Amino acid sequence: MMGNKKIVLAYSGGLDTSVAVKWLTDKGFDVIADCMDVGEGKDLNFIHDKALQVGAVESVVLDCKEEFAKIFVGAALKGNLMYENKYPLVSALSRPLIAQKLVEVAKEKGATAIAHGCTGKGNDQVRFEVAIHSLAPELEVIAPVREWHWAREEEIEYANQNGVPIPADLDNPYSIDMNLWGRAIEAGVLENPWNTCPEDAFFMTNSVENAPNEAEFIEVEFKEGLPIALNGKSLELHEIIKKVNIIAGKHGIGRIDHIENRLVGIKSREFYECPAAITLLKAHKDLEDLTFVRELAHFKPVLENELANLIYNGLWFNPATKALIAYLDETQKVVNGIVKIKLYKGLATPVGRKSTNSLYSEKLATYTAADEFDQAAAVGFIKLWGLPTQVNAQVNLK
């Protein structure tokens, strides 16, 4: 007699994925629950045990924080990545890593399918499924929430009928997604773009009004584009991000209200809390300004925008993304140094920077007697630089 087919479920411990365990079991699958820790701050032991309680045959919990930080957040930092110049790709960065781990567990356990808890309305279904099929085209992907078409009340009724525990925070009016790089908030009163986000929606950040009245200064050291130390203390990247989240969040830094163009064709209203992301991205860009030649400083943002779009749209494993990340790695060889940042009332402001790769020459920039800039050379430069414009004027402005 053949056993049930195995399926690996991306498991969060929430209502949707807990109900999905029972629903998939009823469909004839042996469910392997797979929870990837990318810095949500959840009780992983509780999630592990709950998966078994609701019917999973096996529960896997993976610590992915440093891998998430170095590879995925690392690319975002090196590229100064902001979708639509506003959103630092909080959720979008975690999806390819989660998909990759789901595929690895599926292959290790001999599963024939993978399931996720995304709805049919958002970007994440695309990100997961494109990533999974990029890595393992042979695996079937099932989206229970997309298939069962239940209203929330029907889902709760199904859970009660099948002994699936109802989470204590189910009455939370907001949909939340959180990882090391930030926290996404949507739904509830936020669906009306005129409504101000209530203060009870925030978790990582103080309001500007409640932020300290005194500024705080931090120093972040970078090596090849990535932070390696905070205030002189060497730390793993995920630890630096965690600490900066706390420090910058206290000062009200990182709140973002975004009318976002989703991949699936609709606009959505999203709130984000990204204190570390905003702070570290500003510090990183400031160090690039110190160490990049002009041509690179002007050209790189063009590719940054393309890469942000690729990642937002679920194409992390596309060859174009791989090529652009390789370009970023090449540019970051000179991005070494320390940036001093002022944190005050919602603003993270770089106020000092130094680098062994600095292209800033005080002797060339100064207006004092120490000036080494050859001002006499400017006459010939100006004449040659403006020559095409001058010739055009002589020919056409008659």
Swiss-Prot record:
Q: What class of enzyme is it?
A: ligase
- Keyword annotations from UniProtKB, A to Z: Amino-acid biosynthesis, Arginine biosynthesis, ATP-binding, Cytoplasm, Ligase, Nucleotide-binding
Locate the residues binding L-citrulline: Y87, N123, R127, S175, E260, Y272
**What reaction is this protein's catalytic activity?**
L-citrulline + L-aspartate + ATP = 2-(N(omega)-L-arginino)succinate + AMP + diphosphate + H(+)
Question: Which cellular compartments is it found in?
Answer: Cytoplasm
Q: Does the keyword Amino-acid biosynthesis apply?
A: yes
Domain of life, per lineage: Bacteria
What GO MF annotations does this protein's record show? argininosuccinate synthase activity; ATP binding
Binding positions (ATP) = A10, Y11, S12, G13, G14, L15, D16, T17, S18, G117
Q: Which InterPro entries match?
A: Arginosuc_syn_C, Arginosuc_syn_N, Arginosuc_synth, Arginosuc_synth_CS, Arginosuc_synth_type_1_subfam, AS_cat/multimer_dom_body, Rossmann-like_a/b/a_fold
> What are its E.C. numbers?
6.3.4.5
Which biological process terms from the Gene Ontology are attached to this UniProt entry?
argininosuccinate metabolic process; L-arginine biosynthetic process; urea cycle
List the GO cellular component terms. cytoplasm
Query: What CDD domains does its record include?
Result: ASS
Instruction: Identify the residues that bind L-aspartate.
Output: T119, N123, D124
Query: Where is this protein chiefly located?
Result: cytoplasm
State the pathway, as annotated in the record. Answer: Amino-acid biosynthesis; L-arginine biosynthesis; L-arginine from L-ornithine and carbamoyl phosphate: step 2/3
Q: Which PANTHER family match?
A: ARGININOSUCCINATE SYNTHASE (PTHR11587:SF2)
**Entry similarity comment:** Belongs to the argininosuccinate synthase family. Type 1 subfamily.
Q: How is this protein organized at the quaternary level?
A: Homotetramer.
This chain belongs to the protein called Argininosuccinate synthase
Query: What organism does the UniProt record list as the source?
Result: Lactococcus lactis subsp. lactis (strain IL1403)
